[in-house]
Regions:
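Glycoside hydrolase catalytic-domain context in secreted enzymes
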Residues: 1-363
Length: 363
């Protein structure tokens, strides 16, 4: 069915499926109605999301439902310890259960895709996003990241309460120089493969649906334009069949990194390397029609990207069940969820023993 839909699309509709807009974007409903949008993020009002899905399904030409994304990192309404804290529990089963609770609560608000797990190896405490990761150890990060994927996605993506997971940020984001966000990361290939890529391979083996490219550059090449990462490692070596989304404005930032001359070149570079969906910015909508007309980006390349996006929508069961009925899911913040969050907090506590007076404490 996904192939049939791709064959029926205009070029503009294909680019629309590759575009994601913020929930408060101007003209959002018109974009959905015109088939110029495949996904929204950061909208959590279930009535608004059901209306957007209604417009997509009933008023757009091809009736393709929307992916609805959100950062569901350590709980949704019921809040669990930060992933760094959860890692201190050393308990994959607990972490899988926490992710499952978060998925069910998010699904009750109309969300069907989380931008998690964040599985960057983090070894520099100066970096501001260290709290989102399970930490510094590649084995622990791999095991716990895979547990989160299983918790979010459940036994089947089409099950009520399951949402698609996204492994981020691919790759090396936690190793940025000086702990400065968006900075360069210089990582030898041996260390890259044995440390920083291991959690991502574990997430892939656990069945993660999507990957998110990093803001940062790796050894001088930004992730959103990095042939080695996206094509060689992820697609060719690992055989990933899902789709890749950019991080927020990361395609536009190819020019900020000095990798491309302008927005037009950035759009072509990201599309040709295999960034299937653009988050927030509009470079694909603004420039891909001309780039395809000029032969700088092949329409067959876009066909494969759109196919991967549609395949996930089909696996999620969105064509059969585009709307959300919160009554079919457990009530957020219920007693069972709150008890699990309390248990997770207690099991994440770490007791420090001041043996031999190593810590400079008087008592």
């Amino acid at each position: 069915r996904a192939r049939d839909l791709v064959a029926a699309m205009t070029l503009e509709e294909k680019i629309g499926q590759m575009s994601q807009a913020n929930g408060g974007a101007e003209g959002l409903r018109e974009m959905v109605r015109d088939g110029r949008l495949g996904s929204v993020l950061n909208e959590v009002n279930v009535d608004e999301l059901n209306e957007l899905q209604r417009i997509a399904v009933e008023e757009s030409r091809l009736g393709i439902p929307l992916l609805v994304g959100r950062d569901v990192i350590h709980g949704f309404k019921t809040i669990f310890p930060i992933p760094l804290g959860q890692a201190a529990s050393w308990d994959p089963e607990l972490i899988e259960q926490a992710a499952s609770v978060a998925a069910r609560e998010a699904a009750a608000s109309g969300i069907n895709w989380t931008f998690a797990p964040m599985i960057d190896i983090t070894r520099d405490p100066r970096w501001g996003r260290i709290a989102e990761s399970p930490g510094e150890d590649p084995h622990l990060c791999s095991v716990l990241g895979a547990a989160m994927v299983r918790g979010f996605q459940g036994e089947r993506l089409s099950d009520t309460g399951s949402i698609a997971a996204c492994a981020k940020h691919f790759a090396g984001y936690g190793a940025v120089e000086g702990g400065l966000d968006y900075n360069t990361a210089n990582i030898p290939e041996n260390e890259l493969r044995n440390v920083y890529l291991r959690p991502f391979k574990a997430a892939l083996d656990a069945g993660v649906s999507t990957f998110m490219s990093s803001f940062s550059d790796l050894n001088g090449v930004p992730a959103a334009g990095n042939q080695f990462l996206i094509q060689q490692v992820l697609r060719e070596e690992w055989g990933f069949q899902g789709f890749v989304v950019s991080d927020w404005d990361a395609i536009r930032e190819l020019t900020v990194h000095g990798f491309t001359e302008d927005d037009r070149e950035a759009a072509g570079a990201a599309a040709n390397v295999g960034i299937d969906m653009e988050m927030a910015s509009t470079l694909y909508r603004d420039h891909l029609p001309d780039l395809v007309a000029e032969g700088r980006v092949g329409e067959s390349t876009l066909d494969e990207m759109v196919y991967r996006i549609l395949r996930l929508k089909l696996r999620l069961g969105l064509f059969e069940r585009p709307y959300t009925d919160p009554g079919h899911l457990p009530r957020p913040l219920n007693a069972e969820h709150l008890q699990l969050a309390r248990d997770a907090a207690l099991r994440s506590c770490v007791l420090l023993k001041n043996d031999d007076g190593i810590l400079p404490l008087s008592r």
